[in-house]
């Protein structure tokens, strides 16, 4: 079974499964009927050909098998919790230096100076764009998104090209609030922190139909978010921050 692009194919459906860490056992069980991506040592995503009774199966299979869908947070709530005032007051002198802030959202505007250092280089250490299908070596999982290094993002900045493109603007906004650099009239909460970015792909139409979510509404799958968290965790361990 070819599994390279099942994260995007509408003729395959996603199931979130819990296992006990024995990956070989899971692979053996589903080797002829589906494809498996392991999120961590507890959860995995099973991709199987969409059954004819997919909609009906929602009522007879365990609810937790079906990834939930999530939308975007209203950006007005950021000011409501006082996040903007934390850095403006600067009472504690905290700048975020030597820490990593992970953003799992709609992408980020890499050309924005708020996310660059004093010499115009990116503060993004690494990024995983789930919305751009990759090859065997370019995704966090085979065929599932494209991973960029900080050097590759710097090259894109120099060339004036865009990766991690944020069509919505939500991810760029939240990244700016969290750790945007200092300007004359704006400072993020942690202006000297580094970033690791995960750009989520939009939810599949087959799952939208299951939950009644319109095609034109931004919606993101639980398993994609969980995979993003696992990616951030691995990067934090790698950088020891």
Locations of regions flagged by a protein language model:
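Charged/polar, solvent-exposed surface patches and flexible loops
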Residues: 25-29, 126, 227, 234
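Short acidic, glycine-rich surface-loop motifs adjacent to enzyme active sites
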Residues: 69, 229-241
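Subtilisin-like serine protease catalytic core
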Residues: 90-224, 240-241
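Autoinhibitory propeptides
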Residues: 2-11, 15-100, 107-123
């Amino acid at each position: 079974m070819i599994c390279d692009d099942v994260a995007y194919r509408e003729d395959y459906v996603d199931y979130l499964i819990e296992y006990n860490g024995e990956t070989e056992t899971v692979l053996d069980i589903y080797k002829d009927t589906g494809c498996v991506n392991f999120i961590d040592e507890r959860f995995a995503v099973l991709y199987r050909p969409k059954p004819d009774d997919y909609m009906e199966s929602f009522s007879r299979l365990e609810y937790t098998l079906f990834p939930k869908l999530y939308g975007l947070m209203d950006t007005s709530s950021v000011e409501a919790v006082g996040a903007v005032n934390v850095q403006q007051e600067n009472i504690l002198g905290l700048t975020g230096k030597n820490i990593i802030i992970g953003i799992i959202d709609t992408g980020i505007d890499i050309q924005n100076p708020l996310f660059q250092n004093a010499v115009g280089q990116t503060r993004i250490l690494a990024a995983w764009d789930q919305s751009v299908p990759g090859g065997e070596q370019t995704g966090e999982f085979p065929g599932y998104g494209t991973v960029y290094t900080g050097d590759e993002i710097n090259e894109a900045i120099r060339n004036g090209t865009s990766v991690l493109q944020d069509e919505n603007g939500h991810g760029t906004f939240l990244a700016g609030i969290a750790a945007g650099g200092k300007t004359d009239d704006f400072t993020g909460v942690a202006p000297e922190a580094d970033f690791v970015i995960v750009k989520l792909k939009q939810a599949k139409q087959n799952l939208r139909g299951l939950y009644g979510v319109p095609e034109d509404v931004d919606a993101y799958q639980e398993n994609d978010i969980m995979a993003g968290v696992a990616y951030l965790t691995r990067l934090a361990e790698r950088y020891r921050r």
